Regions:
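Short helix/loop capping segments that flank catalytic or ligand/cofactor-binding pockets
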Residues: 28-30, 48-49, 136-138, 152
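Short glycine/proline-enriched loop/turn "hinge" motifs that connect secondary-structure elements
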Residues: 27-34, 117-122
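Short, glycine-/Ser/Thr-/acidic-enriched flexible segments
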Residues: 23-27, 42-46, 133-134
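A conserved FAD-binding loop/helix module that cradles the flavin
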Residues: 126, 131-154
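Flavin-binding catalytic cores
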Residues: 11-13, 55-92
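A glycine-rich dinucleotide-binding beta-alpha-beta segment and adjacent secondary-structure elements
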Residues: 73-135
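Mid-domain catalytic core of redox enzymes
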Residues: 1-31
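Conserved FAD/dinucleotide-binding core of flavoprotein oxidoreductases
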Residues: 31-70
Length: 157
């Protein structure tokens, strides 16, 4: 995992950094045809609302191209021609898949840095995992959310 911190904010985003997760080459699911690389950053959900389809696609493509250019500037061994499949998503994409426009989770602050969020729900056998529990980016956010659940389920073992 890497985090690239830039001098200026990413266009159409509220951050000057992006987080990179790279699959393990031995991962038969994610790396079957080469490495899988996920890049994530922060953007306000409301920014993507009220745009025409053309405006939306243009802004999304502009942001994607900016991030890819900065990504390639930081990795000498990866070239544009190495990218076989490329797509980007916004809060509208997020909504289409999980019916939420924003990430969930409890933000980490100076007061909460040593507190693990709860994965419990009021329903027996139903737990929250992933970014619902830990508001992290990419695979680390998912993994930490699952780790919280694992500790909860095995606490009395």
């Amino acid at each position: 995992h890497y985090q690239i911190i830039l001098k200026k904010n990413i266009p159409n985003c509220i951050s000057n950094s992006f987080f990179i997760s790279i699959s393990d080459i031995n991962d038969e699911k994610l790396s079957r045809d080469g490495y899988s690389i996920t890049i994530s950053t922060h953007s306000k959900a409301i920014f993507w609302e009220g745009l025409t389809k053309d405006e939306y696609e243009a802004k999304k493509e502009f942001t994607q191209n900016f991030i890819i250019k900065e990504f390639l500037n930081n990795f000498d061994n990866i070239k544009q021609e190495n990218i076989k499949t490329l797509f980007s998503a916004t809060s509208k994409t997020f909504y289409r898949y999980i019916n939420r426009t924003n990430c969930g989770g409890k933000p980490i602050t100076a007061k909460t840095i040593f507190q693990l969020p709860s994965c419990n729900t009021p329903f027996y056998g139903l737990y929250n995992v992933g970014d619902t529990v830990f508001a992290g980016q990419g695979w680390p956010g998912v993994a930490i959310g699952v780790n919280v659940l694992n500790k909860e389920l095995n606490a009395n073992s």
